[in-house]
């Protein structure tokens, strides 16, 4: 499989082993895992960090295997899901930081190209999220408004 904005092929990475049931050594029930996910979200952690913390500190290899639901689904059921999906928010944050850099260094052509690529990814993701209903149909990416979205 090729990269999005390059002509190179990607490097193969490690894959999670295919499983249908949780491992026997996991000591947590589905309700306990859901409570942990909600608690960590209320502490301000992102979904990616929640998964990492559960893996490293609690020994939970996969929330989906134990609960049957992904972390985002659990957060949606408890009303804690972010209004803008996390991957889109991270891309917007990168674009805002790069625009700030380009204000100070206007001749940085390589970074300008990087900004174009990041904003292309943002537009592609917005189109997908509008189609699936995770974003309103009228939602648009605006660089000036993005500064206000990013904390």
UniProtKB/Swiss-Prot annotation:
Residues 1-18 have a biased composition (Basic residues). SMART domains: Ribosomal_S13_N, Ribosomal_S15. Residues 1-22 are annotated as: Disordered. GO terms for molecular function: small ribosomal subunit rRNA binding; structural constituent of ribosome. It holds the Pfam family Ribosomal_S13_N. Keywords: Ribonucleoprotein, Ribosomal protein. GO terms for biological process: translation. CDD domains: Ribosomal_S15p_S13e (cd00353). Gene3D superfamilies: 4.10.860.130, S15/NS1, RNA-binding. GO terms for cellular component: cytosolic small ribosomal subunit. It comes from the Archaea. Part of the 30S ribosomal subunit. Belongs to the universal ribosomal protein uS15 family. This is Small ribosomal subunit protein uS15.
